[in-house]
Amino acid sequence: DLNSMENTIDDQTSAILIEGIQGEGGVTPATPEYLLGLRKLCDEKNILLMFDSVQCGHFRSGRFQSYQRILEDIENTFQPDAISMAKSLGGGIPIGAFWVKEKHSSLLSAGMHGTTYGGNPLSCSIALTILDV
């Protein structure tokens, strides 16, 4: 609920991280109103809205990302600030990725964000093929 979320934000809050569709909690999608409300709240508070799309990204919801599925019937320009991705990105081959809007890219510099899957040529080749499909 947006009121509870707003009441938990303080001057130490830098981001909100959510799953657009909770996979482990019973495949429960967020409502369009909630996602749009979170975007507005994050913009007002100058904090990042981040999505965990490990479970429900890459067409598992019928759209490239879960928020696109949830908001498909609403005219909007919604976009999260960052998205974590894995699992279906590699079609069963281990890979993970972290996407961030260009305006926030300066928050990460070389060496600040590492990965145990980073740079694997097989995984990267498969992920590029999946993204091309």
Q: Where are these predicted regions, by residue range?
A:
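Conserved N-terminal phosphate-binding loop of PLP-dependent enzymes in the Aspartate aminotransferase
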Residues: 1-133
